[in-house]
């Protein structure tokens, strides 16, 4: 009699686990069943339990093992990294880039093969995407990380890795053989430094005013902040940049060179904070950072800083000041189309606002022909003008958001009155967008496109 098997989807874990813990001492884990519907929405359902049947678009030659003879013969053609890893370079990487360092986010393509077998027991190609991990975190088997750490961006290489640095003597049958060395074919696509967000906490209190001690840790915080921005974690990025600024401001410099390095890094950090604050819809903080930048640059901020100042001022409704900031940025980069587009947008906003103001005040001081008409006070008319101005700004922001690749943007609920919140809800509905209030952070409003799925 045939058995009926239900189609399955990949199961997500409630908490992540590392391969190193799995191999060394074993781990317990729980499956998050609530994610099954999301897997179906993303097209991850499959009636097949074979990785190969799901990889129809992958070239079979790419998946085929580059060596099907004994590993001893291949080792003779390789260079020894250490007693457990042998390497053969098949494509040279970028010579002007260093090998993958510790504390880096690296993206690779790889396939792993058992001795004498043509098909891989594991391959990122079967999943149709690159594999990304952080070095130094123990999230991949030790042998693969050591191999990747020996490579430069763009490099392709083959490695024979001892079972001692892979899955140990027991393995995980039937897919992972016990006490088996493996051949790995690896390509490093690129890497970026992620820094160390906690390194600065280890500085002794008596050394926290010494520039030579603090500066490397501030650089680490800067790298961590940049990495957080790439991942869309703007609050984490802001915290990292703020801590770096605070630590540098507290330092005493011993010479002109240290002062130059401090000013250079503080300038970069404050510019990055302006970008992050604008992303977080905190324009007032962005303007505060601009004051610090003007002091650091002796009144000559960069084009990037002026552009971000323009965005912050526009968000605050200071259109004339925003246009002036954009014009100063344009003077530094006349050919920059993005700046030109913002200037045109500001000119339209200013004209529209001035026209609306003239119309409101004209109605405020004109005589009504009909006595039955209810006359509005200048204060009421001014309130209507502000409400209309808010609606225009919010609609413009929503239109710009719809035209970007971003899937969601967050706001602070406390920044809006109840009337403004109601108006925003109405506009979001008109534009077929979702406006949700976080159940965890009550102050966070999220505007998202209809195809965004939340866990």
UniProtKB/Swiss-Prot annotation:
The protein, known as: Inactive peptidyl-prolyl cis-trans isomerase shutdown
UniProt cross-references to PANTHER family, sorted A to Z: INACTIVE PEPTIDYL-PROLYL CIS-TRANS ISOMERASE FKBP6 (PTHR46674:SF1)
Compositional bias segments (type: Acidic residues): 44-54
Domain PPIase FKBP-type: 103-192
Predominant subcellular localization, coarse grouping: cytoplasm
Origin species: Drosophila melanogaster (Fruit fly)
Result of knocking out the encoding gene: Recessive female sterility with no effects on zygotic viability. Some strong alleles (WQ41 and WM40) also lead to male sterility.
Protein task: Co-chaperone required during oogenesis to repress transposable elements and prevent their mobilization, which is essential for the germline integrity. Acts via the piRNA metabolic process, which mediates the repression of transposable elements during meiosis by forming complexes composed of piRNAs and Piwi proteins and govern the methylation and subsequent repression of transposons. Acts as a co-chaperone via its interaction with Hsp83/HSP90 and is required for the biogenesis of all three piRNA major populations.
Family the UniProt entry places it in: Belongs to the FKBP6 family.
GO CC terms of this entry: cytoplasm; P granule; Yb body
């Amino acid at each position: 009699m045939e058995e009926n098997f239900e189609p399955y989807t990949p199961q997500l874990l409630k908490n992540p686990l590392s391969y190193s813990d799995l191999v060394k001492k074993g781990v317990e884990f729980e499956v998050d069943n609530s994610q099954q519907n999301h897997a179906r929405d993303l097209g991850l359902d499959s009636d097949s339990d074979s990785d190969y049947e799901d990889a129809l678009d992958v070239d079979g030659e790419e998946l085929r093992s580059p060596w099907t003879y004994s590993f001893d013969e291949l080792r003779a053609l390789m260079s020894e990294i250490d007693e457990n890893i042998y390497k053969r370079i098949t494509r040279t990487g970028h010579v002007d880039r260093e090998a993958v360092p510790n504390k880096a986010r690296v993206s690779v393509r790889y396939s792993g093969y058992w001795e004498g077998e043509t098909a891989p027991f594991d391959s990122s190609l079967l999943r149709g995407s690159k594999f990304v991990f952080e070095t130094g975190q123990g999230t991949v088997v030790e042998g693969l990380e050591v191999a990747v750490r020996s490579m430069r961006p763009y490099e392709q290489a083959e490695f024979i890795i001892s079972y001692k640095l892979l899955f140990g003597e027991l393995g995980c049958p039937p897919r992972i053989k016990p006490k088996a060395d493996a051949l790995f074919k690896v390509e490093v696509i690129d890497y970026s430094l992620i820094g160390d967000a906690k390194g600065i906490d280890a500085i002794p209190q008596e050394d926290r005013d010494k520039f030579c001690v603090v500066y490397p840790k501030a650089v680490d915080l800067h790298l961590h902040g940049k990495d957080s921005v790439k991942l869309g974690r703007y609050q984490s990025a802001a915290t990292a940049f703020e801590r770096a600024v605070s630590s540098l401001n507290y330092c005493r410099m011993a010479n002109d060179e240290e002062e130059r390095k401090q000013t250079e890094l503080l300038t970069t950090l404050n510019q990055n904070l302006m970008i992050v604050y604008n992303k977080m819809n905190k324009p007032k903080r962005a303007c505060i950072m601009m004051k610090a930048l003007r002091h650091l640059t002796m009144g000559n901020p960069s084009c990037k800083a002026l552009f971000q100042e323009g965005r912050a001022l526009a968000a605050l409704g200071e259109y004339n000041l925003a246009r002036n900031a954009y014009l100063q940025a344009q003077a530094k980069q006349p050919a920059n189309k993005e700046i030109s587009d913002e200037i045109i947008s500001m000119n339209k906003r200013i004209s529209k606002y001035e026209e609306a103001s003239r119309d409101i005040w004209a109605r405020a001081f004109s005589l009504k022909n009909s006595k039955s008409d209810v006359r509005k006070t200048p204060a009421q008319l001014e309130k209507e003008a502000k409400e209309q101005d808010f609606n225009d700004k919010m609609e413009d922001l929503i239109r710009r958001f719809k035209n970007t690749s971003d899937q969601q943007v967050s706001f602070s609920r406390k920044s809006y009155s109840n009337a403004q919140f109601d108006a925003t809800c109405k506009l979001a509905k008109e534009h077929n967008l979702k406006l949700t209030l976080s159940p965890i952070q009550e102050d966070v409003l999220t505007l998202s496109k209809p195809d965004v799925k939340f866990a």
